[in-house]
Amino acid sequence: KTGNLDNSKLNRKVFELSYPRNFLKEISLASKEFDVEEYDMLGLIRTESFFNPIVESSKGAMGLSQLMYTTFEECATKLKLENPNITDPATNVRLGTFYYSNLVKRLNNSDILALFAYNAGPTKVRRWLKTSKVGLGLYKNLPSDLFLETIPISETRNYGRKVIQSAALYAWLYYEQNPCDIVNEMM
């Protein structure tokens, strides 16, 4: 069973057109290298750039993974890359996946916290966690879905929801995973 999604051929084709797997080779390689699910990175990249390798945000984030240049440089240095190009799809995906993987590890192996940090930065996420726990009278293990509602920046709240939704649909469409399970795993 795959939840309530209709698996008819027409609906499936519409979903596949809406959730393409552009740059799959690059995403697959980086996902394997940094132990991240392909569907997580597909969801992140779809949300960040809709697979446009030369897009630049109003805040200066660039490429498929929408990395800020300072983050891109830090990741390139850690991986000992010489003269990396931020708009090169393979390089951008590799460094974006590396960065996301590191955020997951730094934030208690939590996909949702890593997504919030990918969008707003790890310092803000740690601050929000601390103030949310204090504000709600909780001192440990604040449930992720409750934490999501306490984030003061709507862009980050919505970003987390969009990436999780996209990852769940990719998992269902291409990896025969139950989307409800993916949402639960990521939360």
Feature locations, PLM:
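Catalytic glycan-binding domains that act on GlcNAc-containing polysaccharides
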Residues: 1-187
